[in-house]
A protein has these predicted regions:
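N-terminal signal peptide c-region/cleavage motif recognized by signal peptidases
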Residues: 15-17
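Structural signature of multi-pass, alpha-helical inner-membrane proteins
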Residues: 20-156
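Bacterial N-terminal signal peptides that target proteins for export
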Residues: 1-7
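Hydrophobic alpha-helical segments of integral membrane proteins
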Residues: 10-12
């Protein structure tokens, strides 16, 4: 009988903790790698917009931990876009990436899929990443659960 109570209590706690977890948004920014780096450091990918076959670094330069706020947009094709505001660490990482990798491609992954590709043609020191389109309503909903909107008042 005690065993049945323990199992029942465990199932109730497991179910409540599983339902309490909301899906957070993941963002990864990967710089273009070198095919000579090998499979440990770079992986081949076909870019969605230009269709180029490139190698990207397996380690992301910027992640969702570097994002401090966002602003969603409705794109003309019916999807969504977003402006991501980076914190100080993300701003420095983006600035460094844009200086060191000028002339290369950067891929932005949102929730595990490629949202956009960016070509680095100048220094980016404002700490903002713009995703013009290609995001779904679920992506925006997960962003809403993860970060505040740019310019929104902080909750007390």
């Amino acid at each position: 009988m005690t065993r049945a109570w323990a199992i029942g209590l465990f199932l109730i706690l497991a179910a409540s903790s599983a339902s309490a977890k909301s899906k957070k948004c993941t963002v990864r920014v990967h710089g273009q790698g070198n095919e000579n780096d090998g499979a440990v450091f770079a992986t081949p990918v076909t870019t969605p917009i230009s269709g180029k076959n490139i190698f990207i670094e397996k380690i992301a330069t910027i992640s969702e931990h570097d994002v401090s706020a966002y602003r969603p947009y409705a794109a003309s094709d019916g999807s969504f876009g977003a402006l991501l505001q980076l914190d100080d660490h993300g701003r420095l990482a983006l600035d460094t990436l844009s200086v060191e990798r000028r002339g290369s491609t950067v891929l932005v992954f949102v929730n595990g899929r490629i949202a956009t590709e960016l070509f680095i043609d100048r220094r980016v020191s404002d700490g903002q990443i713009f995703i013009a389109s290609g995001l779904t309503g679920a992506d925006i909903a997960s962003m809403e659960k993860t970060w505040p909107q740019i310019g929104a008042k902080k909750r007390k």
